[in-house]
Amino acid sequence: MENIIKIDNLYFQYPHGEDEEPKLAIKGVSLEIEEGSFSAIIGQNGSGKSTLAKNLNGLLLPSKGAVYVSGMDTRDEDKIWDIRQTAGMVFQNPDNQLVSAIVEDDVAFGPENIGIDPVEIRARVDEALDAVKMGKYKRKAPHLLSGGQKQRIAIAGVVAIRPRCIIFDEPTAMLDPRGRKDIMEIIEKLHREGITVILITHFMDEAVKADRVVIMNKGEILLDGTPEHVFSQDELIRSARLDVPMAAEIAIYLRENGIDVPPEVVTAERLKEFVCQYK
């Protein structure tokens, strides 16, 4: 598989006042994201994960180093719209992403702005709304919807552009448990359909669903690997003020007490399967 995103020795520093000490939000990060993969980037508030996300499609530009999206340098102004069409982004607060008074018009906004034919736009809108199970709300006003429904509309707006990659920047942070579950099911479905997913989250039970987990701490990469590898490093994870998933924590406890628990037991489903063997 080829890489859809390459991050090369990225540094990022936010603008600061004359009396303020400069502080790097990202410090020398290098990553390669394979096309079709599902990566979760986690970390405490202030770890740099959302700053990293915004560098991935040119919302922020490197202070040093480079980010390439399908070979395009995010600093190339002539390529910025191609970059954002390739790597779409869904934000934490859907209200920041909804722009129209009617749901179907909101989903159509992106395709309209990249010059898609009106007949094709209608087809894309219907397809995108069906993908997020919101087809029956197409003529509703977004402000009348729940937080989870609004987030689904925001996702549909990105899907309608048909990006190869979608960056989700804490998309469930403002939702209740049911809303979180619904959004994660949509994200997993999009990944199964071939879209590259980059999920920024602080929920460990979401991160374990990825193929790869990257832990950010103080602007740097602390850990990078499969969920099985990353969540077995419980002491290192706790040093970054994070918790391991409950299932992984139970598995670690069982291993410490002489039970041979396989390394892939990091989710509730895998733990249940393992425990059921002892019935």
Task: Label every PLM stretch briefly.
Residues 42-44:
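The feature captures the beta-strand-to-loop junction immediately N-terminal to the Walker
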Residues 57:
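Helix-to-loop junction immediately C-terminal to a conserved catalytic motif
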Residues 65-75, 83:
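Conserved ABC transporter NBD signature motif
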Residues 119-137:
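Conserved ABC ATPase "signature" region
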Residues 141-145, 149:
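Conserved ABC ATPase signature
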Residues 166-169:
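Catalytic Walker B motif of ABC-type/P-loop ATPase nucleotide-binding domains
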